[in-house]
Amino acid sequence: MLDKKYFLTILLFLKYLFLLRLTPDLEINRYISFFEQCSNFKSCINPYSQIDLLDKTYLTFPYSNLMYFVLLPFYFLGNVLNISFVNLSYLFFEVVLIYVLQKLFNVFLSNLYFILVLNPLIIYSIGILGQLDFIPLTFFMISLYYLKDKNKYYSIFFIILSLSSKIIFVILLPIIVLYFLKLDETLDENIRTTLY
């Protein structure tokens, strides 16, 4: 009989093989045309320089520049390997998220598999539809990890990455700022934290 750890690793591997064979709808219908504009260095740095050439019926890439730059290496790698860059980025960020969640909450890997890795809703929303919410979520969880370690500047940095990639995380910002201010021991530290 297979050890539980090996069984879960095989399940994870099979999921990744399955996802890498798919190309999400949003990637096909919206993201590809936006990323294909990146034909030279100048057009890659400013992806909106030729946006007037794209279909005007909807916003082609409804995310920030940060999300674009995060996905750009996955786009190039996906082109070389002939696989979906959205699913490739998901697999990368999922591995990072699993690692961070293990460190943050001292959770066994086997407990994360069925909640995160084998969750059909996550597989559908990312693998089939192509939603990119896992990237800012990973940044936010990394921020919480550094917050737990009382390393507030790294935490602030990853909160900024999270907010820059998806604005919805601004809802949690007041709670985290209050926690930062609670960690500070002097008024001078409070002022520096607030200004940072």
Give the label of every model feature segment.
Residues 123-124, 143, 153-177:
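Membrane-interface alpha helices of multi-pass inner-membrane proteins
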Residues 100, 135-152:
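Specific aromatic-rich, kink-prone transmembrane helix
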